Amino acid sequence: MLDTESRWAIAESFFKTRGLVRQHLDSFNDFLRNKLQQVIYEQGEIVTEVPGLKIKLGKIRYEKPSIRETDKGPMREITPMEARLRNLTYSSPIFLSMIPVENNIEGEPIEIYIGDLPIMLKSVADPTSNLPIDKLIEIGEDPKDPGGYFIVNGSEKVIIAQEDLATNRVLVDYGKSGSNITHVAKVTSSAAGYRVQVMIERLKDSTIQISFATVPGRIPFAIIMRALGFVTDRDIVYAVSLDPQIQNELLPSLEQASSITSAEEALDFIGNRVAIGQKRENRIQKAEQVIDKYFLPHLGTSPEDRKKKGYYLASAVNKILELYLGRREPDDKDHYANKRVRLAGDLFTSLFRVAFKAFVKDLVYQLEKSKVRGRRLSLTALVRADIITERIRHALATGNWVGGRTGVSQLLDRTNWLSMLSHLRRVVSSLARGQPNFEARDLHGTQWGRMCPFETPEGPNSGLVKNLALLAQVSVGINESVVERVAYELGVVSVEDVIRRISEQNEDVEKYMSWSKVYLNGRLLGYYEDGKELAKKIRESRRQGKLSDEVNVAYIATDYLNEVHINCDAGRVRRPLIIVNNGTPLVDTEDIKKLKNGEITFDDLVKQGKIEFIDAEEEENAYVALNPQDLTPDHTHLEIWPSAILGIIASIIPYPEHNQSPRNTYQSAMAKQSLGLYASNYQIRTDTRAHLLHYPQMPLVQTRMLGVIGYNDRPAGANAILAIMSYTGYNMEDSIIMNKSSIERGMYRSTFFRLYSTEEVKYPGGQEDKIVTPEAGVKGYKGKDYYRLLEDNGVVSPEVEVKGGDVLIGKVSPPRFLQEFKELSPEQAKRDTSIVTRHGENGIVDLVLITETLEGNKLVKVRVRDLRIPEIGDKFATRHGQKGVVGILIDQVDMPYTAKGIVPDIILNPHALPSRMTIGQIMEAIGGKYAALSGKPVDATPFLETPKLQEMQKEILKLGHLPDSTEVVYDGRTGQKLKSRILFGIVYYQKLHHMVADKMHARARGPVQILTRQPTEGRAREGGLRFGEMERDCLIGFGTAMLIKDRLLDNSDKAVVYICDQCGYVGWYDRSKNRYVCPVHGDKSVLHPVTVSYAFKLLIQELMSMVISPRLILGEKVNLGGASNE
């Protein structure tokens, strides 16, 4: 029998052979190997307007990532680190062979450079994917870096997996209540870059109507079938179903189209919708075009594919009628069998297709232009390689993809090791987060083992942003023609053959009605006598390796339905399971021994047919046991590792099954904010902002997954001695008390790095920036003191202390506008654009990097580091969602101590536990204590319970402590023994990146906004604290009139305006006469100064612009002393 260790060996082998970001790498590798060439083949050849000239397209290939320093220089290979440091794009040049054909005479094939393709790190095109560890260290890479991201303009970009409803599948549902549509079937047909939705609706009058893009209105079902070549009613009826009851339901639809009897008439009917008022031939031609190109394009776009489309449409209509007759349930849109995840390869294919089309369009234009001028054909000179390069780079840099999707690529989150891995495994749903799609946000049963049940954000994205579970993989997809061939070889009879046998050979309809329908990727292939048997045969040939392991098959049998669904498309989330035969798993102890010795790997077990990947649809046929002891002869599969239902982050939580579920969700969010060692090459990286914990520790209470994820090598936290007690009252409301002496010994110290960089840009017209120390005459000169740290080259030197406002890189630029330039002397014309340390930040210059960009401009990067020692207000959290800020630091002498002299590092208030039910934390405290006393880490993997709590308590008793983990404690200030025993244990605490030093902010005077003249907002702009409407209401309630005036007028935007005493308008200042003048009465009236809020003056003037005439009526000013004067 497989014990825990054996199953763990299988799971461990999975992570070793597949890594943690396999899904992106597989997808991108498939793009490089197959899809890239496929896009070229789709284009086939470039046809021009020039008579007799076309260009055939051949093979495409890519080289190793490289750059060309200057326009004419040689190509040179680069490393990812060089790309990061010099703000380059890590991309490979791509070459396409082209054959010019002039007057049917083929020329010599020429290979032409057509652009650069950004390369995913660790993919097949990346040379670092097979370098040994020492070589990786030599080129400045973190040897454990998993790859799966791109480097664009020096920054790391991840492509986020996009979850979508499966395309090319018919989904049926009830119509909206109250409308005249009773049932709906939708299919989004997607092929070669465009998606077309086809809607099939059953109306209250029992007719069936079809609507799709480019054809206005609805088309009756029978008419579109005739247009597709099903001329007689009998053809149409048998295409839909062999069942007389369903055939009867088609009568109203057939009657609706009774006047149209031929394919030509049907095409003319459609032509009248798309080409109104044209000649009949034109109408028919246009209708044929529309049907071929925009109706179900995934089945093909040539006239030969019309029959195929007819059968597809008929099977969709059959589905609607089955729903109407109560023979099937509506499709569940949230079932994971109906979802597909689009990964980097998919998204890159659609992006490259659009870029390549733009490239072809430009090439055609250039060819025609050069032919008009009568030049010799020289392809090399006409190809503009930057079209593809820029299109792809721009999409990756901004995240704006083709098809109007935003946020597809994001900056890789490098807060710590976990946050990076989690970002690479994230899955985003395409639903709008503004709507309350409750069902879509819920955890669905089919997500078991595919999506992490805990890791999802709080707030508007909850349930829409998910993360892959540990063992989940995403299918890459194989060509369906292979599977189709196998199905026909196994004896599947095509729909056409069945109809032919019934109509021509007069075979019995009843016979075929009992047969199973066979679907391949949602398309009806045909009929088979025994569906269960067929599914079994397909599974067997998959397990024997005759069929690709990408293929999944499900047999669906209900009272009415009898269907086999075969899937082999891309984007299905699948999970591996051990195959069980007669109650015994096929993986035996012999296999485990070989696994542990490294003789075989996980992939070998898949090849041997002992483990298989199951998608959500096939899992409907599986009966999976959670543990070997649960197996019965009925079981078909066994889970490899029960806690693999969790994602990467949730699997670091010890004892998560003892916590209330939302607590695990909170921890999943906070683990991404904890500080640790985010990359082992941090010293040479130039991240915009980075945090580094000085002394990260491995948790004493481990879960098995920590090792395979790599958390033990890149931890983010430290083990703290925790006492759960109320002490001094400074740990109320989730704050914690920390031992000041522990902090002085270096506990939870961290460093914050911030990068400042600038480049000498060259402007059109020969002007350029200069990195130098600015001279006193320059516009915007800051004063000598600010430039004191600069060296002769205008850059600060390393290990210099800097404070907010100090210049790190001196730089002068030409003026923004030309008219300035003409008036001023050349020296005055320059403006100071130096890079200064951020306001309120200080630190030490850590690294200065001077290099060149690809254009040959000088690039300077300066990294400043700042030591962060924990202080009051810094945020900490355990691994159970228990977050709190430091309430006070107490010296060790004043902290409580146990009889053995142990002093806690952290004191947590007991009120943090009962209502939150984080029992996992109490168990961790006990486990940590046992680990520290016994000297071996404790395994707290979920669903295992090894070692059991009771056993640990017995051991703790043997080691001389109370089994309930409590201690007799003495008050540190008085030395008195406390009445209660206090729970002492060791808990892993994480320091989060919310620190007081980054948030503390106050201001007296400072900058104001130009428009309203009110103080700016926010810490970065030295803004004020807003005294809002509710605060104002409080002061009104208190009756403090002077205070209201002080806050809302004197200290905000007090302004004096001059008002005409006759008309009440705001006057203007006449410089020549040196006085204020009324815009209506000119000099004839007197203007009086009035103190108002500047925002009020602005409001008046904005109202005037809308032709509303506000006037201020002046009265006597009343002094508080009682005497009145003007």
UniProtKB/Swiss-Prot annotation:
Gene it is expressed from: rpo2
Annotated compartments: Cytoplasm
One Pfam match: RNA_pol_Rpb2_4
Residues reported to bind Zn(2+): C1060, C1063, C1078, H1081
Catalytic activity of the protein: RNA(n) + a ribonucleoside 5'-triphosphate = RNA(n+1) + diphosphate
Cysteine pairs bridged by disulfides in the record: none
Subunit details: Part of the 13-subunit RNA polymerase complex. Interacts with TFS4.
InterPro entries in the record: DNA-dir_RNA_pol_su2 (IPR015712), DNA-dir_RNAP_su2_dom (IPR007120), DNA-dir_RNAP_su2_hyb_sf (IPR037033), RNA_pol_bsu_CS (IPR007121), RNA_pol_bsu_protrusion (IPR007644), RNA_pol_Rpb2_2 (IPR007642), RNA_pol_Rpb2_2_sf (IPR037034), RNA_pol_Rpb2_3 (IPR007645)
Alphabetical keyword list: Cytoplasm, DNA-binding, DNA-directed RNA polymerase, Metal-binding, Nucleotidyltransferase, Transcription, Transferase, Zinc
Protein family per UniProt: Belongs to the RNA polymerase beta chain family.
Cofactor stoichiometry and binding remark: Binds 1 Zn(2+) per subunit.
This protein's name: DNA-directed RNA polymerase subunit Rpo2
Cofactors demanded by this protein: Zn(2+)
Function, as annotated: DNA-dependent RNA polymerase (RNAP) catalyzes the transcription of DNA into RNA using the four ribonucleoside triphosphates as substrates. This subunit is involved in DNA promoter recognition.
GO molecular function, one term: ribonucleoside binding
GO annotation, cellular component aspect: cytoplasm; DNA-directed RNA polymerase complex
